[in-house]
Amino acid sequence: XIMVEKDPVKTSFEKWAQPGHFSKALAKGPSTTTWIWNLHADAHDFDSHTNDLEDISRKIFSAHFGQLGIIFIWLSGMYFHGARFSNYEAWLNDPTHVKPSAQVVWPIVGQEILNGDVGGGFQGIQITSGFFQLWRASGITSELQLYCTAIGGLIFAGLMFFAGWFHYHKAAPKLAWFQNVESMLNHHLAGLLGLGSLAWAGHQIHVSLPINQLLDAGVDPKEIPLPHEFILNRELMAQTFPSFAKGLIPFFTLDWSEYSDFLTFRGGLNPVTGGLWLTDTAHHHLAIAVLFLVAGHMYRTXXXXXXXXXXXXXXXXXXXXXXXXXXXXXXXXXXXXXXXXXXXXXXXXXXXXXAHHMYAMPPYPYLATDYATQLSLFTHHMWIGGFLIVGAAAHAAIFMVRDYDPTTQYNNLLDRVIRHRDAIISHLNWVCIFLGFHSFGLYIHNDTMSALGRPQDMFSDTAIQLQPVFAQWVQNTHALAPGSTAPNAAASTSPTWGGSDLVAVGGKVALAPIPLGTADFLVHHIHAFTIHVTVLILLKGVLFARSSRLIPDKANLGFRFPCDGPGRGGTCQVSAWDHVFLGLFWMYNSISVVIFHFSWKMQSDVWGSISEEGVVNHITGGNFAQSSTTINGWLRDFLWAQASQVIQSYGSSLSAYGLLFLGAHFVWAFSLMFLFSGRGYWQELIESIVWAHNKLKVAPVTQPRALSIIQGRAVGVAHY
């Protein structure tokens, strides 16, 4: 069975040159300016171009190659900047004093003021992407190597663009190929994750480890042999790692402990660099490779062994959920939007977890002491997680509107969730109200007691304690666990769990135990509140995407629509798309509090300088536990204390940050105005809550009604 079709679509630059060629309506050209917005909205909405599932699948497949090409170009640009406009070699010689910079502002109208002195005789903008630390970890010792990698990135980008064109225009896979889920799982697990990790582990062992070992010992980067010399010359490697002299003999004689000089299991951080032991990370990636190479043989393909995904899903029938997974496999295989939703949700959870690993287990040398980069990486990965979660909800709603077939989905898990949607939404709504009032109420109580001069009646570590006992138990367990589970390890996975390990590099704290107290308990419940509100908005958008009491035939109106026609007042801003819009606002709210919590907590309890005698002087002097228990403390000791430096930056090389700071707050305040106008959204939520009141026979006589759009805008502009 040949799985590709030859030359299915002509390569035509004339066609591509015509704006809107993908849509009959748009190809006619503009009649109003709305046309240009629709171009942007529909260019990648392949569902709207055609109903042919095979063609849609090919377009998505091809677009993935295009995306990879763009990523390679972007990466190449990063490496090129490191080669052409950076002080990487100076930083490599003295990473504790020189600040990383790979951007020089050209003098056009005076913005060269932004080029500050970053050390190493270099004027530029300090960068906080962590690339320098990553380059050192991968064994790059010169700017020439960065040039070569940048060129390699462009070559790979070209290959990706070619592959995208080839697999749509020259040899396009057939639908059966796209729907062969087991083969896809096997190939991605074994190929991408398994062989990818194996290749990276190989690079780490043969190139990164010897070079970093020499760098840590203080050898001048210019005197370190080039990467290929380590790969080709076994004696050179054996100088650093003696077991290399034995070659592969210990591997085949199963005498693997011989390799423990370069595949370690130490735990904790390297005291020279403040990063994870690179011998630990090489061991880790080798283990991951083995794991995924095995996983890549789990699913049944041409060979008769292993599990078929459909059978695996059907086998999960417990007593309560009898036919629970019936037809779920078919839905995932045939509906791209459902698969995107599940994948985006899983990847988002991973991204948010990764954000925490970047500071708790800093993977690269000298990353932990570069505080600005640590803040940036945490923020960056939290934002990615947030976008992906909202994207998961968006695609789940698109799936509900476009691909959901109620006839095939009877009484399975999906159907049961949808039938319980009123109970789910009204409970979530109650949880949000409870969390919001109680967590904010604790702060307001503290502000009031503080203002009345009654500190003994406040919730804090020195008055009424609300210790996060479960979190402390988890921390303690992780601090002690390696003693029994990994007796040979030198330390637990991270100093943050507790104990007395403080890692300092060059007089700066890299990482120390992070104590949790009443202040963390309070802000944690703000996190719980904002996240639950985000979930409420997004889930409501998904569960009511096809129908609601307000608009029973919503599925016919599509994923995004302004109102249900002119005759139905109060149905505006109620589409699934509008829920994504409102969900994004709350995702931003959630992340703001998370980043505030992280940056203040780290500056107060972890980061700082350390004296010769070993006395730690934290950046904000450990004020988090007492100050952050009141709203006033957050405003005065965090927001104002940290913002005043930015606001007073005009005339220094930091001035751009002051301007961006002002501008970002203006955008934020302006956007609040639009939040209050979701008329139909609120009406739909109210109907669900009224249902819950009717169930319990406590419904009010006066019928609850959402604010009109005019009223909502009045409230919005007043707040603004």
Curated annotation (Swiss-Prot):
Chlorophyll a binds at residues 673, 681. This is Photosystem I P700 chlorophyll a apoprotein A1. Chlorophyll a' binds at residue 665. GO terms for cellular component: chloroplast thylakoid membrane; photosystem I. NCBIfam families: psaA (TIGR01335). It is a multi-pass membrane protein. SUPFAM superfamilies: Photosystem I subunits PsaA/PsaB.
